[in-house]
Amino acid sequence: MWMGLLGLLQGKPSFQAAALAVYSLASYLATAFAVNNFFDAESDALNPLKNNPFVKGCGKSAVHLVTANQAVAFLLVAACAPTPSLAAYAAAVLLAVAYSAPPFRLKGAAGLDLLSHIFYFGVLPFYFGAALVGAETSLTAFYTASILGAYSAFLQLRNLNADRRFDRIAGDRTLFVEHPQVSRALLYASGAFSVVGAALLTPLSAAVALPLSLFLGWKLGWERFVDSLVAVSLSLPAVAVLCGFY
């Protein structure tokens, strides 16, 4: 949802646009997680760190409820949003479903698991929000979308690394299962690109975020340094816009 709201704040959203964005993005995330949890239940049952509700007895009715809600959200977007925003939303939902669900199950195809995540979890939600408010194409928006794409890659690679043993057992040929060394290099590269990009795009915000990010990185590991610096650096200007400072 955060990526989509950053896109929304590329312009000046009305209350209607903001409400539509929040509801449709929340519905999209619910769909993505419900479908992923449903089709990952077998492998997640082997992983004690996973908290998959379908492993703990949640029935198919939850998927039906989420799907019905997604249909309502899609109809609202189709009725109220401009065509580019609708196209981005539809693409994000379809990719999120195709990532987990057969017969496509992009998660099980090395390379496509990463590429699809970059778009459906990073670039497309941002573009949906920006198009919803009719934000003009600009270098700042392009750079922001690029950073979000890299950060989405970082998040995906981190998850694939943590799940690689269980994905291998389940038969998912993820990038980390098939090419662990390349994946590890991409993990570091995407994290570095995200941090450097956020710092160059919003240097003042990055300077504000740096002390907290260094502390979190020292206490919790370098990945939390990346999370906090990217999130805070990109969010502070949006918060300033929201508060009417710009």
Report residues per predicted region:
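Solvent-exposed interhelical
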Residues: S24-A78, G149-V195
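Small-residue-rich segments of transmembrane alpha-helices in multi-pass membrane proteins
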Residues: W2-G7, F54, L114-A130, F176-Q181, ...
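A cytosolic-side transmembrane-helix exit/cap motif
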Residues: N37-D44, R105-L115, G134-L139, L160-R168, ...
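Membrane-embedded alpha-helical segments that form the functional core of polytopic membrane enzymes
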Residues: W2-F39, S85-A98, T137-R158
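Transmembrane helix interruption/hinge and helix-loop junction motifs
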Residues: G11-S14, A78-A88, G134-T137, A198-A207, ...
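Hydrophobic, membrane-inserted alpha-helices
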Residues: W2-L6, A68-L76, Y188-G197, P211-F215, ...
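Extended hydrophobic alpha-helices typical of membrane-associated regions
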Residues: P103, L115, A199-Y246
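Intramembrane alpha-helical segments
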Residues: F54-E136, G217-W222
